[in-house]
Amino acid sequence: MVNVSESSPIDDKKARLKHLIQRLPNLPGVYKMLGKNGDILYVGKAKSLKSRVNSYFAKTIDHPKTRALVARIHNIETIITRSETEALLLEQNLIKEYRPPYNVLLRDDKSYLYVFISADKPYPRLAYGRGKGNHQKGRFFGPFPSAHAAKETLVLMQKMFQMRQCTNTFFKQRKRPCLEYQIKRCRAPCVGLVSPEEYSEDVNNTIRFLKGDSSDIHTALIEKMEASAEELDFEKAVFYRDQLSMLREVQAKQAVYTVQGEADVIAIASQGGMTCVNVLTVRGGRVLGGKNYFPDVDSSEPLADNLSAFITSFYFQVTDDLPAEIILSDELPDQLAVSEALATHFGSKVVIKTSVREHRAEWLDLAKLNTNNALKTKLGDYLELHARFGALKDVLTEVTDRTIDRIECFDISHTMGEATIGSCVVFDQGGSRRRDYRQYAIHDIVGGDDYAAMKQVLTRRYKKQPLPDLLLIDGGKGQLGIAKEVLTELGILGDTLLISVAKGEGRKAGLEVLHFIDHEPLDLPMDSKALHLLMHIRDEAHRFAITAHRKKRDKRRSSSVLEVIPGLGEKRRRDLLNHFGGMQQLLGASQQELAGVQGIGPVLAKTVYKVLHE
């Protein structure tokens, strides 16, 4: 490891770093950019440590994030490795361990969604979720590029093969079929209405379908339908007929690309300082869909270099799945090292291709088309957003000379003081930063006191977090005063521009008024781009707050009715809800059905029924 410590005799930072770079070897390895307090700002890998680190200081830097990084570098540490592959693996391990702020390449790095068949015997469950949790035992299918695609597949599986989707706790406590059985989306294995052998057939058919083997299912269903008819078991024959009908409908709607194979097809494009990457997911020869990413990279760098950075970030930090093939629009400069690193990390080989034919060429063309279309749309949105930030700067010229890049906005949501939630949304000139969004559950205040709620949220936020360039409050002078009070108490009042946006006359949208601490209010025209920006951010804060509030309120209301019933503790409340499958089903239960739940009995059942129906 090579580094320059705080006690270095070279006091000037620039001179110290230059001295360090001169001593770096032309060998592969990993470098860590450190801040003034020794905190890790960025981790990178290099084929040649000396050349790569020197590039940060030997050229004009166009990308604002890289400029900001270089300005904060106080020290550099390096670790030499035996190969470029080893450097890549070490880089990703360090990024996962330290989460450096300047290594955030993807704003949306949620894990992909998978359909999951549990290992529970004899009645496995069908579900979906993000990532492959180590605590879950079973088979995973996917990944699916969107929640819509995963849910659509799950609903389809339910209709066709009727596997259960309930939790194991719910399943074990059932005494009668639930609503899913009534609407023909489950065969009620919980109460023995389907044999383990018949259910196993449904499981096997589900697995075949998810693997793309629908033709085998088609043949098997025809045989079973005919056999059931010959045995005069017409109920089963009708069941298999309905499955066949749905299967044929699905086969007719399947993607054009029906060859076998699994691949991630990845295309990159850059324009106007913005880069877009499209990841097209192909499994079982079917195109499951695609997702567009806009990585925070320097667009002046070669496309292939940025694609390499994206791929390592994507496969090591976002997805849990490595297909047999990765098809790329551009050849990577370190393609062999990337391939070896992925194989080591996932424990399976992958073939990376850039020259493809026939169906694979069609997949790649589709990925390129999606990339270019998404880039064009995003660029238009970005230019509009950039124009709005410029308009805001012009409007605020008389108020501040501060550069406005990061804006944080707060809102409070409740229903007559119930389930109060505070929200914080974050925007910069690249758009919303959803990773930085936060929701705050408000406690220990008088219900309906918006001022106390805002004070609590701001105090909790800025006790730990740095201030943005602009702090936007949804509300009038009163809320602005609360924000001023909080920042004063924290000793950071002058470190940000504080604005509240209030509804104008008649509380009509478009008549908003901006309030400041040391300046007269601003009444902007309805066509003002600056006003449109602030209204958009304010509305997003409101949406984020009210969504969380409704979820909390509804959850509380569904359980609060049961909480007032004497003799009905937490365990019995949970048993009731699990037995009937939710509050709505519980409300529809008779007194006798309530008494049949273990631990309830006729006396308590009478009380529960009375409270629920008064």
Curated annotation (Swiss-Prot):
Coiled coil: none annotated. SMART domains: GIYc (SM00465), HhH1 (SM00278). GO terms for biological process: nucleotide-excision repair; SOS response. It is found in: Cytoplasm. It comes from the Bacteria. One of its GO terms (molecular function) is DNA binding. Residues 215-250 form the UVR domain. Gene3D superfamilies: 5' to 3' exonuclease, C-terminal subdomain, GIY-YIG endonuclease, UVR domain, UvrC, RNAse H endonuclease domain. Keywords: Cytoplasm, DNA damage, DNA excision, DNA repair, Excision nuclease, SOS response. Pfam families: GIY-YIG, HHH_2, UVR, UvrC_RNaseH, UvrC_RNaseH_dom. Signal peptide: none annotated. Residues 26-104 form the GIY-YIG domain. Its main location: cytoplasm. GO terms for cellular component: cytoplasm; excinuclease repair complex. The UvrABC repair system catalyzes the recognition and processing of DNA lesions. UvrC both incises the 5' and 3' sides of the lesion. The N-terminal half is responsible for the 3' incision and the C-terminal half is responsible for the 5' incision. Belongs to the UvrC family. Interacts with UvrB in an incision complex. This is UvrABC system protein C.
